[in-house]
Amino acid sequence: MKNWIKVAVAAIALSAATVQAATEVKVGMSGRYFPFTFVKQDKLQGFEVDMWDEIGKRNDYKIEYVTANFSGLFGLLETGRIDTISNQITMTDARKAKYLFADPYVVDGAQITVRKGNDSIQGVEDLAGKTVAVNLGSNFEQLLRDYDKDGKINIKTYDTGIEHDVALGRADAFIMDRLSALELIKKTGLPLQLAGEPFETIQNAWPFVDNEKGRKLQAEVNKALAEMRADGTVEKISVKWFGADITK
């Protein structure tokens, strides 16, 4: 009888520990992608942080934010040191074949940005022979290579600082999503301008590893996201950071 009680107590303790562990969610981000994720006065904040704070409340998650260079985030995800990446991750075919994704939560466009006064670049076709900066490991690097079949564009990768090299004339243009480019120009005051319209529409979502925990998180996050859309919370967070609903 005593042995049975010990086994039952141990099983209950193990079950409780499992439930507790499942509510701990580590969210990876760069902390350098204004206004999605950035640090101000030693506080991590932004659109992504507000979204996950709300998801955490609704799903009773204990959220831990893990910051790293963007180029290292997928490595952290694959080795289990984080549970997802919240850094405007575009759903490419290659990524969808490798990871589970929550439902898209941002719709945006791939945008060329140049030094102010440079009107010679208006689209991808004008980038031949030019040096174009992209963030290392971002989907924009591969997207640009897909357009540059003949290898005529000098694609230069950076961990950070692509906007400064374009402003200083060290690179002719950089590629990032249109929303971030607009906010970056507004925030930094650097002599930059958008070049033409976005050359590709993109949908961004949170990736998870395809395992038991990843599938559980995907379902729970999708449920919370749907509720947040329905009650206006997603729109409210979006308007706070962008002045418009960027999620549809």
Curated annotation (Swiss-Prot):
The keyword Lipoprotein does not apply. One of its GO terms (molecular function) is ligand-gated monoatomic ion channel activity. CDD domains: PBP2_YxeM. GO terms for biological process: amino acid transport. InterPro entries: Iontro_rcpt_C (IPR001320), SBP_3_CS (IPR018313), Solute-binding_3/MltF_N (IPR001638). Keywords: Amino-acid transport, Periplasm, Signal, Transport. GO terms for cellular component: membrane; periplasmic space. It is found in: Periplasm. Probably part of a binding-protein-dependent transport system for an amino acid. SUPFAM superfamilies: Periplasmic binding protein-like II (SSF53850). Residues 1-21 form the signal peptide. This is Putative amino-acid ABC transporter-binding protein PatH. The gene is patH. Belongs to the bacterial solute-binding protein 3 family.
